[in-house]
Amino acid sequence: MNPMTELGLRFVRRPGPGGRAANLAAFGATAVVALLVTFLIAGSLGLSQRSERIGWRSADKADPATAIGSLNLDDDQRVDGHRLSVLDLAILRPNELAPPPGLDHTPKPGEVFVSPEVAKRWSSLAKQYGVDKPTGVITDKGLSSPEEFIIIRGVQTISADQHPQYVSSWNEKVWDSRMLGLLIAVAFGIILVLFPILSLVGQAAGVAAKRREHRLAALRLAGATRTQVLWLSAVEQAVLAAAGAVVGLVGYTVLSPLIAQIPLGGGRWYVGDITVQWWTVLVVLVAVPVLSVISALIGLGRVSITPLGVVRGQTRKGLSVLRIGLLVIGPVMLAYYGMKAAVLPLLIAVGFAALAVRVVGPWAVQLVGKAMAKAANGPVTLLAGRRLVDDPKGAFRPVAALVLSGFVTGFISVFMPSGEDDPTFNDMRIGVALLLSLVFLTVAASTAAGAVGTALDQAAPARALRRSGVPLSVIERAARVAAVVPVVGVGLPVVGFGALCGLALSGGKMITQGSSGVLLLLGQVVAGLVLVTVAGAAGAPVLRKASAN
């Protein structure tokens, strides 16, 4: 075995002082990343599978001269408070057809096939449809959800004034309109949650990387080559990330029955639709460790190039004000392409806006830190301000996911309609709640890992301050202030920036009705402050112990 590989595995087994907490934080954060990535992939594929089973109902581009059937859909009826869809189907080529998905034979005029939920309530519908008993029950192969309410009724013909749709195949690759809308919404959701997830990946890698930075710098100064140092770090991070990915996959599998209860797209999911496939497992087991290793190696760039700078504690160079120019690109693109309803450019625009927040964040933290240091009237404010100025990237990294969640909250606060009976609005509300849940889980994991990482990062300066006579209480208070200030000073403007991007996309229209948007924004602020406060309290013992030696 390669000596550096063996040494890396030994460091995982025996991480040294402070290493166990760092490894556990990195492991837990990576497990959350794997669970979220699996959920997003499986959910997107599940929508595709749901659409494949019912896509033929939306087919309307077939040539009437060659079509196998004509359709007319009425989805405005109700049964026991549930929306009921009635699909009239006229078969144009009865001798050439296999039955539609989920039906045991092609419906003849007067025959009625119903979903299981409708079959349970048929006694109240029999008189209306003139059939005492349904011809058959549609199986799960022909339904988008076990809770779908639909009647497929065979008719002789559909008149032209009903504007029939024409279908050329039951297996035609046509997206159901509702599933397609959900998939587009999921794409926007993925873009919005992507950067918090990437921040969590970076945080997971950074916690362990920061702990090993001085150790690897010492190895570098002792004669280890740059390649050896990077390989050692990659091995250590890959083992932690792979273990976290496995736990995340197992966690998703265990939670699948609960996830299937989410009533999106007209009802709950079939568990089989969101069950992970072998290639999904492979993607997660490869992608999560690779991203984690890359993040760790980027964080150790200083070690491989200037190890003496790490040991001497050299500060990083200042950040350019040019970063703020990125804030303009996203809103302008959203305003321009929002009018054109071009999905891909809009996804890119949302990504640019979120990226701008991530890139501008450290610069804004440094700006706030300079103002704090200049206006400091005590040691706590001065120490906190200098911390933000000296290492703005390090100060922003633990709260990056939280700040980005503010962008997400501000963005979606514009899109919270209150139409109770509209299925699209209902899907939107559930989607917003689901997106916020994913973001909050990401933020909680990132903040927890960041608390440990920040404590270990500040161990050396805190140790020096304690030796020079600075009280531990002052050091801990300064650390808490340095954690809260980026959330307030940067996070609140980012919430407004997110709302601005949402308004740019909607053409300046506020889709949200009532006070739900304001309550959502207030909830974001309160949740953010609570998370940072709890994280600071959790990180204090780690800082106290790490700076004691």
Listing of model-derived features with the role each one plays in the protein:
Residues 184-192, 277-290, 431-437, 520-529:
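Hydrophobic alpha-helical transmembrane segments
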Residues 1-37, 64-66, 115, 159-170, ...:
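Hydrophobic multi-pass inner-membrane translocation pores used for secretion
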Residues 4, 201-218, 222, 451-464:
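Transmembrane helix boundary and interhelical loop/hinge segments in multi-pass membrane proteins
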Residues 187-204, 438-445:
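Long, hydrophobic alpha-helical segments
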Residues 239-352:
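Hydrophobic alpha-helical segments
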Residues 202-205, 241-266, 282-305, 487-512, ...:
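Small-residue-rich transmembrane alpha-helices
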Residues 7-12, 39-190, 196, 408, ...:
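Extracytoplasmic/periplasmic regions of membrane proteins
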